[in-house]
């Protein structure tokens, strides 16, 4: 039996450069990845370098709220 809340939670990572450069509107969308993280090991917000198909390069993807 599990105690309290689940340790692993599903999170969404969103491209930070697409969000900032939304004014230019060169891209047709915002890159998002769905992954899981362990709350005990990483209590803070997660940031990973992932490939953004709209920017055509590797950028920092930050965790967003659901």
UniProtKB/Swiss-Prot annotation:
Keywords: Chloroplast, Plastid, Ribonucleoprotein, Ribosomal protein. One of its GO terms (biological process) is translation. The keyword Isomerase does not apply. Disulfide bonds: none annotated. Its main location: plastid. It is found in: Plastid, Chloroplast. It holds the Pfam family Ribosomal_L33. Coiled coil: none annotated. The keyword Ribonucleoprotein applies. One of its GO terms (molecular function) is structural constituent of ribosome. It comes from the Eukaryota. InterPro entries: Ribosomal_bL33, Ribosomal_bL33_CS, Ribosomal_bL33_sf, Ribosomal_zn-bd. GO terms for cellular component: chloroplast; ribonucleoprotein complex; ribosome. Belongs to the bacterial ribosomal protein bL33 family. This is Large ribosomal subunit protein bL33c. The lineage of its organism: Eukaryota, Viridiplantae, Streptophyta, Embryophyta, Tracheophyta. The gene is rpl33.
